[in-house]
A protein has these predicted regions:
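Hydrophobic positions on the alpha1 helix immediately C-terminal to the Walker A/P-loop
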Residues: 11
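Helical/strand "switch-coupling" subdomains that flank nucleotide/phosphate-binding cores, especially
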Residues: 70, 87-209
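Extended, low-complexity interaction tracts enriched in P/G/S/Q
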Residues: 6, 17-88, 96-103, 199-206, ...
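Short basic/glycine-enriched coil/helix segment immediately N-terminal to the Walker B
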Residues: 160, 262-266
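P-loop (Walker A) phosphate-binding loop of NTP-binding proteins
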Residues: 3
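Active-site signature of alpha/beta-hydrolase-fold catalytic machinery across serine-
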Residues: 14
Length: 520
């Protein structure tokens, strides 16, 4: 764990290499476990203002052992930041793979996928990079292709995957305009070429446009144009999310153990998940990320402080209780039922007429006087949470839509019959998952799938015997060889590391078994 850019992903890779070396790992499986990283980073990482190679998803790697030999592995992914596909803030980029494609595809391949100059695409903000950067991306693209071959993607599957990615970029340039004769909406004349490049049938998209429901409270044509644009972005996010999920499934097929089910396997799990984030603009995604960090910090506190000191008291050892920064009040603010922030968000998300402003008003009235909540100031629609790592101001625009995380039923139905098997399968799978989650809603802390997956992750963590690796970010400027003492000290404080050092120094850090003690 650690802040964004502290080195969690790099440490995870080093830890995997270390474990494989301890196993004297030279088998094909052990090498494959190490070689899937370029693929995951290309599709799941992006440049942010805090980190040039920031993981925009969390991953839990389970290594299965028989004696000292790795027999298999499984990868679980959490909270992929799909909204990055359609929007990035200043100084940030889309997922790496889009830039790698532009740098690595030949001219003939770009023509086949309908790709033009990268400066033309809205989803990558018309930004590319210098010649040196493009050359580095070209090399990365080749690494991705090699990894796809190694994982077992067939040639046609790779073509389908890149066609979807290219189609996503082209779809982002499709715009809508009023249809004067019918008082409805149509695809703008200027963007019909992008529609063709996205390989979307005009009649199909027309159905999409005409059956997107306009709000009865503001049934203007401009409102319908906006809703059509939202539906377009939803398609792009779902398509990309499914490509990523497909890659994870193929990796798991490759790494699955091939042993007798009755053979007992031991397990080491490595969790590499987002660090605490505080950007100039913080949205729903940052709230989910910071909630995950709050839960992991509570998990750390529970094992290091509460269980440790409880053991001393149980054995009646002389001990002066060490206080620590307990973040339970923050978790209660976010997770309490029925009046926690996320419960109120789920409640508002259930009403089609609810707005982000109504949600913020509800928060302001419910949490008035709460020490960890502050209403937004001025005209900004938002609020602030005083997290264990510091104060974060959230912009509330889009909270309800992102929490619903749904694709309009009409859009889903139209694309189930897509000519690309992957996309067709993806939307059928999404429809099935949505129904399952809704059926389980009464039993879950959260409504939407992304938060449900976080709950499952925490259940796994509490059933394990944990070891904590704290990654410390040396400076905030992404500079090599520079240590900012104040930045480091702040992290040591809010992570609880100073208290951890004290409890280890003053307590009983060596716990030998009786047999080990007798041998000494």
């Amino acid at each position: 764990s650690g802040e964004s850019g502290a080195g969690k992903t790099e440490s995870t890779k080093l830890l995997l290499q270390h474990i494989m070396n301890l196993c004297k790992g030279n088998s094909q499986l052990e090498q494959q476990i190490l070689q899937v990283n370029p693929l995951l980073e290309a599709f799941g990482n992006a440049q942010t203002v805090m980190n040039d190679n920031s993981s925009r998803f969390g991953k839990y790697i389970q290594l299965h052992f028989q004696k000292n030999i790795v027999r298999g592995a499984k990868l679980s992914e959490y909270l992929l930041e799909k909204s990055r596909v359609v929007q990035q803030d200043t100084g940030e980029r889309n997922f790496h793979i889009f830039y790698y494609m532009f740098a690595g595809l030949s001219l003939e391949e770009k023509q086949m996928y309908g790709l033009l100059d990268p400066s033309l695409y809205r989803y990558i903000s018309g930004r590319f990079g210098t010649q040196d950067v493009a050359q580095r991306w070209k090399h990365k693209y080749q690494e991705v292709c090699n990894a796809l071959d190694m994982v077992g993607f067939q040639e046609q599957e790779q073509v389908d995957m890149q066609a979807i990615l290219a189609g996503v970029l082209s779809l982002g340039n499709v715009t809508f305009e009023p249809e004067e004769s019918h008082g409805s909406v149509k695809v703008s004349e200027a963007s019909r070429g992008w529609l063709k490049a996205a390989a979307v049938n005009m009649d199909v998209l027309s159905q999409l446009v005409f059956c997107v429901p306009c709000s009865p409270w503001s049934p203007s044509v401009s409102c319908c144009c906006s809703l059509c644009a939202d539906a377009r972005d939803s398609i792009a996010k779902v398509a990309y999310g499914r490509v990523f999920g497909w890659i994870v499934c193929k990796i798991n097929e490759l790494l699955a153990e091939n042993v007798d089910p009755e053979v007992e396997l031991r397990e080491i799990g490595i969790l590499d998940i987002f660090g605490f984030e505080n950007f100039a603009v913080n949205r729903f995604e940052q709230l989910c990320i910071n909630l995950a960090n709050e839960q992991l910090q509570h998990f750390f506190n529970h094992h290091i402080f509460q269980l440790e000191q409880a053991a001393y008291k149980e054995e009646e050892l002389p001990w002066e209780t060490i206080t620590f920064n307990n973040n339970e009040p923050i978790l209660n603010l976010l997770l309490a039922k029925p009046l926690g922030l996320l419960s109120l968000l789920d409640e508002q998300s259930a009403f089609p007429q609810a707005t982000d402003k109504m949600f913020v008003d509800k928060l302001n009235s419910s949490f008035k006087g709460n020490l960890h909540f502050q209403p937004g100031r001025g005209r900004v629609l938002g609020f602030s949470i005083i997290h264990y790592a510091g104060k974060v101001q959230y912009t509330a625009g889009g909270f309800l839509e992102k929490n619903r995380d749904t694709l309009p039923a009409n859009v889903r139905g139209l694309f189930i019959n897509s000519i690309t098997p992957l996309l067709s399968f993806s939307l059928q799978d999404i429809a099935h998952r949505a129904l399952t989650v809704l059926w389980l809603a009464g039993l879950l802390i959260f409504l939407c799938p992304r938060q449900h997956s976080l709950m499952v992750l925490m259940e796994r963590m509490y059933s394990a015997n944990p070891h904590f690796v704290r990654c410390i970010k040396p400076n905030s400027q992404k500079e090599p060889g520079v240590v900012d003492s104040q930045v480091v000290l702040l992290q040591l404080r809010y992570n609880g590391l100073l208290e951890t050092i004290r409890i280890r120094r003053d307590g009983f850090s060596w716990r030998p078994s009786f047999e080990e003690f007798a041998e000494r």
